[in-house]
């Protein structure tokens, strides 16, 4: 547990201090004596800014959070801070990482309870807001919040093999001695590649010749499966587009928060996230995981399938750690932490929330985005 939380702290720190090389610069306050301002205002989200308070401000903030229960928090209880919050038209001041009594002690020990995001009038000059906030004595850091976009182009669709090429694939791999009986396992050259899957004469649906397979260029699943086919005690959080949680080849290996009702507006388990049965949609801040927006690419579901599509169930594909249904062995569990939705990306603070959510649930993390 201690090791996992140290990794979490490092991951969140990286999230809060990186977006691109351009954003690594720091804007210095005019006086040179204020809190550091991280990133640059160009391209940052308007009407949003992140602030980390100093530890001595915690009691004021805690009292403000308590007073705001049932409504939006708009003031901090710190006089100098509240003057600025009123001037910029603040309509919400929220703790980035919501209170969860099960993990709150660790959250405070890491200082993550001191991070807040301010939502204010979008017409207000963002750079000036940052400079003003940096002069508040109880502020330790100010950071512009940029949008994180996908590292893959949603307008580029994968080309598929022609029926003739697929027939060739199935015909030439049928004799391979493999365990899974999944319908399309023979097409998964990444799992087992004997060099016969694609030939020089094979073409895709656009008539282009495909690159022929190379023997042995795979992840050696055969040898790995002799040792382990999956372990349901392991949770993998997929930070990507939403995962199709009801897909017939995935639903058996989805992580399930039994205390919650999917997409409910009630936070039944008190972790700060309502309706998070299969994970959470951090882009839209709700428990409803979406995967069918016209601008979605299906990448989140694709990744989840590679990791843990139910193996040996007579349909679909074989997940690398999807277990073995025929032997009643479960696969690793997939948690959907949605950080992309249609054409939308998430803010830095939203991704930080996703990372912490995954860590609080003892998950391994897979992230698909720019490095």
What residues fall within each predicted segment?
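Sec-dependent signal peptide recognition
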Residues: 2-9
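Protease zymogen maturation seam
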Residues: 102-117, 134-235, 243-249, 253, ...
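Residue-level detector of conserved catalytic or cofactor/ligand-binding positions
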Residues: 362-371
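Catalytic-core regions of hydrolytic enzymes
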Residues: 339, 343-363
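Inhibitory N-terminal propeptides of secreted protease zymogens
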Residues: 26-168, 172
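Bacterial signal peptide processing site
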Residues: 20-23
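C-terminal motif of bacterial Sec signal peptides marking the signal peptidase cleavage site
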Residues: 15-18
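Subtilisin-like serine protease catalytic core
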Residues: 212, 218, 222-348
């Amino acid at each position: 547990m201690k090791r996992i939380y140290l990794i979490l702290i490092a991951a969140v720190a990286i999230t809060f201090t990186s977006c691109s090389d351009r954003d690594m610069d720091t804007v210095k306050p005019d006086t040179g004596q204020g809190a550091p301002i991280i990133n640059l205002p160009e391209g940052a989200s308007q009407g949003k800014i992140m602030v980390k308070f100093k530890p001595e401000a915690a009691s004021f903030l805690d009292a403000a959070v308590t007073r705001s229960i049932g409504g939006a928090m708009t003031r901090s209880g710190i006089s100098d801070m509240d003057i600025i919050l009123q001037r910029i038209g603040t309509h919400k001041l929220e703790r980035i990482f919501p209170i969860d009594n099960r993990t709150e002690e660790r959250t405070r020990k890491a200082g993550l309870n001191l991070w807040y995001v301010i939502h204010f009038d979008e017409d207000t000059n963002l750079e000036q807001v940052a400079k003003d906030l940096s002069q508040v004595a109880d502020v330790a850091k100010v950071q512009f919040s940029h949008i994180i976009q996908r590292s893959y182009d949603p307008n580029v669709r994968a080309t598929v093999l022609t029926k003739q090429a697929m027939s060739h694939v199935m015909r030439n791999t049928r004799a391979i001695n493999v365990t899974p009986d999944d319908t399309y396992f023979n097409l998964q050259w990444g799992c087992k590649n004997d060099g016969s899957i694609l030939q020089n004469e094979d073409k895709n649906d656009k008539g282009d010749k495909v690159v022929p397979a190379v023997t042995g260029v795979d992840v050696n699943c055969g040898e790995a499966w002799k040792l382990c086919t999956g372990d349901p005690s392991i949770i993998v959080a997929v930070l990507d587009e939403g995962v199709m949680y009801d897909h017939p080849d995935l639903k058996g290996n989805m992580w399930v928060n039994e205390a919650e009702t999917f997409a409910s507006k009630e936070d039944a388990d008190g972790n700060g996230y309502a309706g998070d049965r299969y994970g959470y949609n951090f882009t839209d801040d709700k428990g409803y995981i979406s995967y069918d927006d016209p601008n979605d690419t299906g990448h989140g579901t694709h990744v989840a399938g590679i990791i843990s599509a139910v193996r040996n169930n007579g349909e679909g594909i074989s997940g690398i750690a999807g277990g073995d249904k025929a032997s009643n062995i479960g696969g690793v569990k997939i948690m959907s932490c949605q950080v992309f939705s249609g054409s939308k990306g998430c803010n830095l603070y939203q991704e930080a929330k996703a990372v912490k959510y995954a860590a609080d649930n003892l998950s391994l993390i897979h992230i698909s985005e720019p490095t």
